[in-house]
Every structure is written in structure tokens, then in C-alpha cells.
Amino acid sequence: MNQGKIVQIIGAIVDVEFPRNNVPKVYNALKIDGTAIILEVQQQLGDGIVRTIALGSTDGLKRNLIATDTGHAITVPVGTGTLGRIMDVLGNPIDEAGPITYTDQWEIHRNAPSYEDQASTTELLETGIKVIDLMCPFAKGGKVGLFGGAGVGKTVNMMELINNIAKAHSGLSVFAGVGERTREGNDFYHEMKDSNVLDKVAMVYGQMNEPPGNRLRVALTGLTIAEYFRDEKDSSGKGKDVLLFIDNIYRYTLAGTEVSALLGRMPSAVGYQPTLAEEMGVLQERITSTANGSITSIQAVYVPADDLTDPSPATTFGHLDSTVTLSRSIAALGIYPAVDPLDSSSRQMDPLIIGEEHYNTTQRVQQTLQKYKDLKDIIAILGMDELSEDDKLAVSRARKIERFFSQPFHVAEVFTGAPGKYVPLKETIRGFKAIVDGEYDHLPEQAFYMVGNIEEVIEKANKMTA
């Protein structure tokens, strides 16, 4: 058993001295005698000294305490016993429901599947949210980013996606809360409980109040649990299709920045860690589908100061299949979900994948919205009366499209009092195609606001004129 002693403690950083001929590997977990604290080796400084990051508070630690090398990385429980439970970064239960019964324990540092093991599918994943299904469709086994500044609805959108997909998909989900509000974690737990889908969700939380080491590693803990479900073959000889929700990827980067500064690395652009791209790659490359099973990941990405060129969101962009950009200006109009249809994109936007009708409808909707955007300056200066009849018609349709993108959410029922709506993809395409074809030019634009399918628009318009 390899033992060393603590020689220095600076906040979350602990230096431990081991015999020179038996230094622990980087990422090995160290246990400290008499405490529940786990240290993770980050650097080997020479002379037998390793620099570690503490996963937990270092209060009460002192020099010369004995640290034991476990000989492996941090391990967490995996298997069906994790479903319906809330765990911390080390896999300890934090929901006061007794110990977790686990099938196995896996290390959180793992290699991504090899290139020949990976599989890509082009099957669409219906979300029931009109603007997403039409403008930036999701792929099963793909990666989706929800980009947005503070308070534009990333978490609410993610909750609705979980509500819609987890129920319809009826597969397994893993939720990793990375550096977010504890209140949101609590709300999420009760939301899942009330929806009766708790037995299909494993939750891993490392919230805002926890040390940077916990927040940096909690995403890997959640991912490891998801990988087990994907890779472990059931009676049919196949793994499972898993949904992995990460809220919030930016906090993962931020925790890496804090750890990097504590380790004394020279910061790069805007104060981020020099290893930003590598750290992001380590996480994202493991989120993939194999011939055995798939991981579909939906990640909330906080955009600092609404600047999409900030290194953190910019690095995340390259790993994603679909990007859903939430806009403050659209939220200011009272249109929720505040998705910017011209700024959101998807690799699935191909007629061979989504079909001719869907593709053509989306293109026409984009053209109409772009035309309205181009005319906004003229309208602001000269007013609507100076526009040609064609332009007036385009503006009228664009405003109807904008309002038809709004939709009442199931998870927001408690706040709005309006029952949530799930709109199938076929209904969505039919509704928007009819608007751009001019079938509803005679209806007032208010009738298109906060409804489900196009039939509800007609019903609302009839009530308004009655």
C-alpha cells in the first residue's frame, strides 16, 4: 500500500509527498486517513511530491496527515441501482434514501470509443417544440447545445425537452447538474417525481456552492453512468439508447479555469485555461454512439455577456450537431421559447435526411424572416406605409411566423396557468407551410401567439372576432 504525507495545503490544492520510487500516476485518487476527502493527482512536481485537487472542502486538513494511493482513478457506482437517485461527484447518495445498490464501479477517466466502434445514424428525434423541430431538428445519438445568456430560458427549455423526450422516448436519462443552482436541482427532482419518470433518470449534482474539483469532475461522473447503460448489453445483446443532459457546460469550463489558476498555469485568452480545447474534447469525444447503443446529449451553454465569440461557447460549437440559440431580443418580445430561428442550425438540415417538404418549408420560413429582418430599419424610419404590397405581405407573414413559434410549455404550467402543448412534427410542418403559402393571411397575428397547432390558431381567431 503506497502512502504519503501532506506537506502543503493552499485552498483546494493539496501537495502530498510520496517515496520517490513510488509516485502515484496523474488522475489517481488518494484517500486521507480519518476523513472522507478524496484527492485527485493533477501534477507530479518532482522529488516524490504530487499536486492534487481536493474533491470536497479542505477544512480540518493539516500537514503530515497520511494520504493513501488507491492505485486507480475515482470510481463511481453504475447500473440500474443509480436510477431514481441523486449522487455527488464521487457517487455518494445525497437524497437521504439509503445506500446505492450498484452493479459495478467504473473509473470516471475513460478513453473514447475507437473510430471503428463508433456509429452514426440520421434518425430524427422529435421534441414536440415547434421552433426546434422545424428550424434545427435533433438527431438520435447527436449532440445539441442550448446557447443563451443569463435568464433567457436555457434551463426551462432543457426541462421541457426532458419532459417531452424522456416521456415519449421512454428510454433512460442521466442528468448532470454542473455548477448550477441547487434550487433548480431540487425543482428538477420533484418535476421528474411528479411526472412518474424518476425511475428512468439518474441524477448527478455538483452545484454552485461546491469546490472547483467537484464541479470539474461531476460531468465525467454523469457521462460514466451514461456510458455504462450504452455499453452494457442486455438480454437482446444490445446496449441502450441514453439521453444525457448537462446543465451547464460553461460551468464545467469555469471550474477548469479555477483549477488551472490554482495549479499555477499561465492563463490564455480572456483568462481561460490554456488547456480549454483539450478539456472540452476529453468530455465531448466520449459522448458518442456505438453499434451497441447511443448517447444523445443535450447541453445548456451559458454565453457570457451574450457574446458567442467568447472562447468557452466558441470551443463548444465545434463539437455539436445542432445549436439552439436563445435570443434576449426575442425574449423581450414575450415570445417563448426565445429561440432565434435565423441563428440556430442543425447538420440534419438536408432534404435527404428530413425530407423535401420539411426542408422547403424551413427554407421559405427563413427567407420570410430574413426579409422582415432586412426591412426592419426601413420600417423604423419610414413606417409600414412606404413598403410595397409584396413587402407588406412578407412582413405580415413573418410576424405571424414569429408568434406561431411561441408555445406553452408543460414545465411552465405552474407559472403561466396555460396547459403545455406537444406538437408533432407533421403538424408543425403543415402549420408553417400554410402560413408561407398565404392560407391564413386573413387571420390576425395575435391569434398565432402561444398556441399549439394551426387548428388552435383558427379557433382562437374565431373567438377574437366573435
Swiss-Prot record:
The keyword Hydrolase does not apply. Disulfide bonds: none annotated. Its main location: membrane. ATP binds at G148, G149, A150, G151, V152, G153, K154, T155. It catalyses: ATP + H2O + 4 H(+)(in) = ADP + phosphate + 5 H(+)(out). GO terms for cellular component: plasma membrane; proton-transporting ATP synthase complex. The keyword ATP-binding applies. Keywords: ATP synthesis, ATP-binding, Cell inner membrane, Cell membrane, CF(1), Hydrogen ion transport, Ion transport, Membrane, Nucleotide-binding, Translocase, Transport. GO terms for molecular function: ATP binding; ATP hydrolysis activity; proton-transporting ATP synthase activity, rotational mechanism. It is a peripheral membrane protein. Its EC number is 7.1.2.2. It holds the Pfam family ATP-synt_ab_N. CDD domains: ATP-synt_F1_beta_C, ATP-synt_F1_beta_N, F1-ATPase_beta_CD. It is found in: Cell inner membrane. Produces ATP from ADP in the presence of a proton gradient across the membrane. The catalytic sites are hosted primarily by the beta subunits. F-type ATPases have 2 components, CF(1) - the catalytic core - and CF(0) - the membrane proton channel. CF(1) has five subunits: alpha(3), beta(3), gamma(1), delta(1), epsilon(1). CF(0) has three main subunits: a(1), b(2) and c(9-12). The alpha and beta chains form an alternating ring which encloses part of the gamma chain. CF(1) is attached to CF(0) by a central stalk formed by the gamma and epsilon chains, while a peripheral stalk is formed by the delta and b chains. Belongs to the ATPase alpha/beta chains family. PANTHER family: ATP SYNTHASE (PTHR15184), ATP SYNTHASE SUBUNIT BETA, MITOCHONDRIAL (PTHR15184:SF71). This is ATP synthase subunit beta.
